[in-house]
């Protein structure tokens, strides 16, 4: 269910908003199921539902939950959080009954009978944002903590939820505001002092300090975005090159079927793993070759689609295969690199490299490191059979995307990076206008745009459609 129209919520009178309700725990068999209510009628609904006349704030009360005819729907605990001292800033009720879809749905239906409306996705969090209980970064951190794919990502999300990321952004906003005031004062009162503030170096120094801090926060945010999103790694190559074996080795389990029959993999296969703290979204693909097999041909088409969506492409080849009459590994690498999005990366993976030092290596297709270097590629030697080189591969993947999160990293999203980059660009414009053209009005305008871009991160300046997209991606009940 979509989030209610932000225009109908932002800065609304709380009494005019409907009381909302939703199941806040996963549906299915479980020990406890929680239904959350928020709004002006939440308290009265709880009283009618239980037959109680009063609930003390922040005190758990054991109650039976009744249908209109007096039959018992369920029994459990009622928790009352009186606004504004609640998550949403409104009166909040939590009904903690037994888990299970039937009981939970019956209880929720009764709550709707008493006047509550179904909450939209993320609507509880939106009301918390609307009532200044949390900012946009903190609201997003709730969803990021729930969706975290690693312990490091979860910890980073909790730090963002506690306000650490917002604090960094707000400190930068404060600096920008003071800088704008300084510049605009120099413009509005040019004759008040003998000193030319646009030329004395003070504003330039403050501006450069702000630029340096923006770059530091941007670097931190890049690590946070990698922690949150991970990278998409696609395994491609000729049939029987060892792609599926490599996926199994990285995943630590037999996820893909491996046989000696070329063309065993007919479709893409996804697996998500966390290695060295970095989340890898792995995609195994069908071997690339000319074929008359209709099903295999469809798989190859899907493989090429997956390649275009890769952050890093692993072009796997088998060093024991004689490819004299086929396309060479380097030719295939260049062909695949041409299909990658701009600024994406390709690594050549030499599988069965443990056999290169054996007498049986005669006639193998191993590519010289010099030839690879001259073509601008990098090769990692691995053995899917023994596991040799796998650690080197993981370290190379981390290095390629610059993944080295600090101990106290903060979760970040792509939109945060976009806003920080735009802020940095506007500050660079301001610096040029100041140092080259001495154009105070243009400096002030660039600083205003920088402040606006930075304010988008915490929600100080955010379009309603953006808010709808962000909160609409949340769980029902959050």
From Swiss-Prot:
It comes from Psychrobacter arcticus (strain DSM 17307 / VKM B-2377 / 273-4). It is an enzyme of class 3 (hydrolase). Mg(2+) binds at residues 244, 265. K(+) binds at residues 240, 259, 261, 264. PANTHER family: TRNA MODIFICATION GTPASE GTPBP3, TRNA MODIFICATION GTPASE GTPBP3, MITOCHONDRIAL. It is found in: Cytoplasm. GTP binds at residues 240-245, 259-265, 284-287. This is tRNA modification GTPase MnmE. Its cofactor is K(+). Homodimer. Heterotetramer of two MnmE and two MnmG subunits.
